[in-house]
């Protein structure tokens, strides 16, 4: 789905607008999803994710891996398939 949060899995919800006379009209509620670049320290690279603003607050507080784990997600959901199973190369340490 296009408008779905990667961390929480929240998506568009449908329901009714109910007037004072209890007349019901169908409507949808869209999740406030933004595209955000997040740095994965373990893999030493940037990843673009679609994340809800509520999940972004959790992410800033706990970190990406903990936030995804708390919501029952998997980190491989945001990792492109060509990177799954590949360990990042160690960065050379400058000594002077």
Curated annotation (Swiss-Prot):
| Keyword Hydrolase applies | no
Pfam families given for it?
Ribosomal_L28 (PF00830)
Gene Ontology MF terms in the entry: structural constituent of ribosome
InterPro entries given for it?
Ribosomal_bL28, Ribosomal_bL28/bL31-like_sf, Ribosomal_bL28_bact-type, Ribosomal_bL28_sf
Q: Which GO terms describe its cellular component?
A: ribonucleoprotein complex; ribosome
Where does the record locate the signal sequence feature? none
What sections of the sequence does the record tag as coiled-coil? none
Listed GO biological process terms:
translation
Alphabetically ordered keywords of this record: Ribonucleoprotein, Ribosomal protein
Q: Which SUPFAM superfamilies match?
A: L28p-like
Q: Which HAMAP family match?
A: Ribosomal_bL28
Please state what the protein is called: Large ribosomal subunit protein bL28
| Annotated organism of origin | Leptospira biflexa serovar Patoc (strain Patoc 1 / ATCC 23582 / Paris)
Which gene underlies this protein?
rpmB
């Amino acid at each position: 789905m296009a408008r779905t949060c990667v961390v929480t899995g929240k998506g568009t919800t449908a329901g009714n607008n109910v007037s004072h006379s209890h007349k019901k009209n169908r409507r949808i509620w869209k999740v406030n999803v933004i595209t955000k670049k997040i740095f994965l320290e373990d893999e030493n690279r940037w990843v673009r994710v679609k994340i809800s603003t509520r999940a972004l607050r959790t992410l800033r507080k706990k970190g990406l891996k903990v936030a995804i784990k708390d919501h029952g997600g998997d980190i491989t959901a945001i990792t492109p398939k060509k990177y799954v199973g590949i360990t990042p190369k160690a960065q050379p340490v400058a000594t002077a």
